[in-house]
Amino acid sequence: MDRQSLNRRSPLRVFERSIPGGLGRGNIGVVLGRAGTGRRAFLVDLGLDSLLNDRQVLHVSTRASADKVHEFYEEIFRDLAEAVHLEDRLRVHLQVERNRMIHTFVDRTFTLDRITRAANYMKQHMQFEPSVLLFDGFPDWDMTTADELAAIKNLAGQLQCEIWLEAKVHREGDELDARGVPLRVTRCEEHISVLLRLQQNEDHVRLQLLKDHDSPDVADVHIELDPRTLLMVWQ
């Protein structure tokens, strides 16, 4: 299969049709899930799909080294390429590498100001303007405020990109709303356009749409995360 066919047949095209226009530049999306459901894998799947569509991606992690994040991309790309018998694999891989930047911040060194300055530097000196910005491990939902989410949304507007965040749902101790969303997330929801949940169902993980911008009708998304390959698949 060539890259164009892969893009057309990607399960994430179904996700985009479920949310007319997708997340959209200048907006924040959040994926929720318990430990082990694949929140980071989902972010990487989103990133890889964007890269295969010639979009530049900035992946920021506060809980893993750059080598570890890169290894994760490599593993998922390899599994995807083998699953679809991807043509011209080396050339496509090189394109993915050129269009992706990974920044990691450890020991609580991350601030929005630092990533803003880094993004501006990349734009001015490296001709790198991400269409998608992925945050793995940020913010700390136990401590974050609506003002901090507003600042993240402002960053999405400044960079004219989509921003995806992840949030862990604790098995015990989390206060939840009627949808099962932790209240520590809902207190910032005015700044969140799309909410997704990775729901563990026996031997598979189902993707569930909880919020679609301001739409009162939320579509059923027929996509799962394969726990073996960490790839998105048709349900």
Regions found by a protein language model. Name each.
Residues G29-L32:
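Short hydrophobic/aromatic beta-strand immediately N-terminal to the Walker A/P-loop
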Residues H59, V132-D136, C161-R171:
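Structural recognition of the conserved hydrophobic beta-strand(s) that form the central parallel beta-sheet
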